[in-house]
Regions:
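Mid-domain alpha/beta scaffold segments of enzyme catalytic cores
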Residues: 1-143
């Protein structure tokens, strides 16, 4: 059995999700894990998991969202993570590729989401680009 462990089907780029899902199933992909990583895609991913038996989700805020995420957003995320067919927190982490102007915000958001994952006993999907050392240092603080 094949499982697609990381895709972004909840973004608006797909005109025909039914076709994409059908093709995956015909190719032998039995389960699809959709990673929602911003405010726009959280509910869209959950909707997909409700519509398709083969779709599961991970929910979280990508590091590029660090300056946009509020404490209220994190509370909403925490509630959504308790939803059926949620299998993890992600895609979360650090991304220094395009600049380092919001590093501290990224680190704070990453740690807050790791704390939520730890509390809810959920695995995480890590995004780390040009930030390996900081990512590892932060991860060492968590189980």
């Amino acid at each position: 059995m094949f499982i697609d462990t990381h895709c972004h089907l909840s973004i608006e780029d797909y005109d025909n999700i039914d076709y994409v899902i059908k093709n995956n199933l015909e190719a032998g992909v039995k389960k699809i894990i959709v990673s929602a990583c911003n405010k726009r895609t959280l509910n869209a991913a959950l909707d997909l998991s409700s519509k398709y038996d083969c779709v599961y989700v991970t929910l979280g805020y990508h590091p590029e969202e660090a300056s946009l995420v509020t404490n209220e957003d994190l509370e909403i995320l925490k509630k959504l993570l308790k939803t059926c067919k949620v299998v993890g927190v992600g895609e979360i982490g650090l991304d220094y590729h395009y600049g380092k102007e919001n590093i501290e915000l990224q680190k704070q958001l990453f740690e807050k989401q790791l704390s939520i994952a730890e509390e809810l006993k959920l695995p995480v999907v890590i995004h780390s680009r040009d930030a390996v050392n900081d990512t590892i240092e932060i991860l060492k603080k968590y189980d």
